[in-house]
C-alpha cells in the first residue's frame, strides 16, 4: 500500500501551522508536505519534524508574489533572476529539512494576466525555452544534495486559470526537453482527472517518470470517496505497478480533517 503524507496547507487547518505537525503525527501520518515553508525559519520547522518523527516529503519553490496572483516563475523570461534566487532559497530549506523533493511552479501564461503587457510579443517557444533552461538550472543545483525537482500539470479550467503547464502530455514532453534524471512529474490525480482523465492508462504508461503523486476527489477537491474517482482501484494499481513513492493528501476536508480520514487504508 502506498505511503500517505498529510498536506499541511490543506489538512489540519483548524489549528495554526506549527500545531499541524503534531496533529498529523497523532492521526498516523509519517510524512508531511505543504505549499511553502518560507514564513518560518527552516530550523524551527526541522524541530517540529523531529519532535513528531515526521519526514518532510515535499514543498514548493517560491511562486513569486502569491497574494498578487503570481503562480510561479519558471516560464517567465523577465523573472529569471528571481527564479534563480528562489532555487537557492529552496535549496537551503531542503538541506535543513532533509527534503528530497521540491515542486517548481511554472507560472501563468502572460496572455490575459497582469504581466502580459510587459511580455507583449513573447512567443510560446520563448516561454518554453525559458522554462526548460530554468528547470535545467534547478535540477543541477538540487542534484548537489541528491534531491529531485517536480513539475506538476495543474488544471487551468477550474483551479488555476491561465496556468502555463496545464496539460499532462505537455508535462511528459517537457521532461524529455529538460533531460535531467532528477526531474520527474508530480501527478496530481485530481488535476489530471479534470485535464484529461484516463488515469489508469496514464499511470501504467508513465509510472517510471512519476516522482510524486497527490490526491483529492472530483468535483469539489474533497477527500477520496466524495466524488467520481475510484481511489481504491487506483491504489491497488499503484501497488501492482510497484510505485514506492509518497502520495500527498492535498484535499479540502468536507467537514473537519479528522472526519475526512476514514478513507485511509488500514
Q: How would you describe each model-predicted region?
A:
Residues 1-28, 38, 50, 89, ...:
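Histidine-acidic metal/acid-base catalytic patches
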Residues 7-8, 31-33, 76-78, 122-126, ...:
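Short, contiguous strand/loop micro-motifs
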Residues 33, 57-60, 103, 150, ...:
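Conserved beta-strand positions in the central sheet of alpha/beta enzyme cores
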Residues 33-55, 60, 106-110, 158-159, ...:
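Glycine-rich, proline-tolerant flexible connector loops at the mouths of alpha/beta enzymes
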Residues 44-53, 134-142, 202, 233-237:
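Catalytic-core regions built around general acid/base machinery
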Residues 63-65:
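Aromatic-lined carbohydrate-binding surfaces of glycoside hydrolases
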Residues 73-184:
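Active-site acidic/histidine proton-transfer and metal-coordination neighborhood
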Amino acid at each position: 500500500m502506498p505511503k500517505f503524507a498529510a498536506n499541511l496547507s490543506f489538512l489540519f487547518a483548524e489549528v495554526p501551522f506549527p500545531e499541524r505537525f503534531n496533529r498529523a503525527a497523532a492521526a498516523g501520518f509519517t510524512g508531511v508536505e505543504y505549499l511553502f515553508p518560507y514564513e518560518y525559519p527552516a530550523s524551527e520547522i526541522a524541530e517540529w519534524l523531529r519532535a513528531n518523527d515526521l519526514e518532510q516529503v515535499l514543498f514548493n519553490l517560491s511562486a513569486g508574489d502569491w497574494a498578487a496572483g503570481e503562480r510561479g516563475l519558471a516560464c517567465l523570461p523577465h523573472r529569471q533572476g528571481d527564479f534563480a534566487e528562489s532555487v537557492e532559497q529552496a535549496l537551503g530549506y531542503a538541506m535543513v529539512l532533509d527534503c528530497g523533493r521540491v515542486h517548481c511552479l511554472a507560472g501563468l501564461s502572460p496572455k490575459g494576466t497582469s504581466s502580459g503587457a510587459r511580455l507583449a510579443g513573447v512567443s510560446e517557444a520563448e516561454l518554453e525555452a525559458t522554462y526548460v533552461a530554468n528547470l535545467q538550472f534547478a535540477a543541477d543545483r538540487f542534484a548537489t544534495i541528491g534531491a529531485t525537482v517536480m513539475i506538476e500539470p495543474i488544471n487551468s479550467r477550474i483551479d488555476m486559470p491561465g496556468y502555463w503547464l496545464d496539460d499532462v502530455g505537455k508535462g511528459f514532453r517537457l521532461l524529455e526537453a529538460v533531460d535531467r534524471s532528477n526531474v520527474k512529474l508530480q501527478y496530481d490525480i485530481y488535476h489530471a482527472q479534470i485535464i484529461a482523465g484516463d488515469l489508469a492508462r496514464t499511470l501504467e504508461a508513465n509510472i517510471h517518470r512519476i516522482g510524486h503523486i497527490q490526491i483529492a476527489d472530483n468535483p469539489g477537491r474533497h477527500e477520496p470517496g466524495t466524488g467520481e474517482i475510484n481511489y481504491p482501484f487506483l491504489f491497488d494499481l499503484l501497488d501492482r505497478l510497484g510505485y514506492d513513492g509518497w502520495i500527498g493528501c492535498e484535499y479540502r476536508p468536507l467537514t473537519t480533517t479528522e472526519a475526512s480520514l476514514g478513507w485511509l487504508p488500514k
